[in-house]
Amino acid sequence: MDLTPKSAPEGRYVQAGDNTYYLLEMGDGRPVFFLHGGGPGCTSWSDFAVVSQMFAKTSRCIMPDLLQYGKSDKSEITGPMWDHHAGSMVDLMSELGIDRADFICNSWGGTIALALAARYPERTRSLTITGSMPVFRGPLCPLPEAGRRGRNARDIYYGGEGPTLEKMRQLMARLEWYNADLIPEETVVMRYEQSLDPEEMALAARSDSPRGEWQDLEVDLKNVECPTLFCWGLQDDFLTPDYPLMLMNMVQRGQLHLLDASSHHLQEERPEHYFHIVNSFLDQPDYKQ
């Protein structure tokens, strides 16, 4: 399958409470939010360009750039970070006239969705979570780099001589894709060019300080009531398969699917497999209970 992202559809800006989001929309049907990861240069389109077009055949795909990413607001966050993101996402849903939705998420976006589902259960019909770290411990051993692998990678990418195309390529090959030979050059360039955004570089220069207070959601996950699929790459370089197994048992209605020959961005690396797994989850009989 061709993994090269096509040109993004025309997006729009939406004011949601105190924040302005930039979002893309495709398709009609049940509303599905796609929440992207937190790596340098990530946007909704960089993470979901190929697979979202499959979902758009039957769903209304809503693809916001998360706060501090892409073309959305990049103001400093104060207070608990996941509470801030979750509350702002609910504001966005309300502004769009959406009461409840499915959420398909990678990494950073998945932790936002879990916080949202725990605090606003009436707004979530289901969650699909890939590569997210809502809990600061592993079930069997400490997390890689004490759970700071992503933050360390960001600081290395922006440090030294600053962002380069080769540093972006190496970051994606080392941490996000299982088979580096499959990474489309167009995706590398898209991420690299976005990472040069002056506001993103200003945020990165301050490391964690403008992101808000980190939150461990372990005590909150028991409040996640909706069906939740943890769809994980067997070779995820951030969190090994025992971690989503732990998460699955922390939420009320968890399921786990492991996909081989996949790492942290399996929705990009194996979009057809990812689509069929997630779409079957959304269509399963008990999903509507």
Identify the residue ranges that each predicted region occupies.
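Short beta-strand/loop motif that positions the catalytic acidic residue
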Residues: V224, F230-W232
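Catalytic active-site module of serine/aspartate enzymes centered on a nucleophile-bearing elbow/loop
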Residues: G254-Q289
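Flexible "cap/lid" loop of the alpha/beta hydrolase fold
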Residues: L114, A118, R125-P163
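Conserved HGGG/HGGXW glycine-rich cap/lid loop of the alpha/beta-hydrolase fold
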Residues: Y22-K71
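Gly/Ala-rich beta-loop-alpha elbow adjacent to hydrolase catalytic centers
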Residues: C105, G109, A113
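Acidic catalytic loop of the alpha/beta-hydrolase fold
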Residues: Q235-L239
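Active-site loop/oxyanion-hole signature of alpha/beta-hydrolase fold enzymes
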Residues: Q53, M63-I104, H276
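Conserved alpha/beta-hydrolase catalytic His-Asp/Glu region
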Residues: G138, P144, E161-N223
